[in-house]
Amino acid sequence: ENVIYINKAQTAELYPTLAHEGYPGHLYQNVYYAARNDDPVRYLLDYPGYSEGYATYVEGFSYSMMDAEGYGDIYQQMNMEMYEYNLALCSRVDLGVHYEGWKKKDVRAYLRSFGMNDSQADELFQMIIENPANYLSYYIGYQEFHELLTDYKKNGRE
């Protein structure tokens, strides 16, 4: 049985979260994949850039499906751009910490220039320390799916 549990305390992002975790995101992706009966070795391997990239792409795409109640395309575009911005910013901090050796003070200083306070910076720093390259799997995977669609459209296939 496929179940998605909803945190009723945080419903502001419910629509894109359901797109990411449910349909057309991970739920669709996993049910489709399981039905293919692929080589068993593929079930042993983990491809977070592929799985999270796909779910992140469809989550972002969900913003274009929202009923913006009179705000139209501007509202949808703003949400999508803010979503990409946040992924890019967190990915940049991840690279700073794990590749360039940033310390907590460096993350705080960097994020202050984007309007984030120290407690927000500390929370992001802790998540990045605990899960290296996690944001990169979402963001780079998302970019790969975006590029795939762009190439597909460029070659006249729609």
Please place each PLM-identified region on the residue numbering:
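Long, His/Glu/Asp-enriched segments that create or flank divalent metal/ion-associated functional microenvironments
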Residues: E1-E158
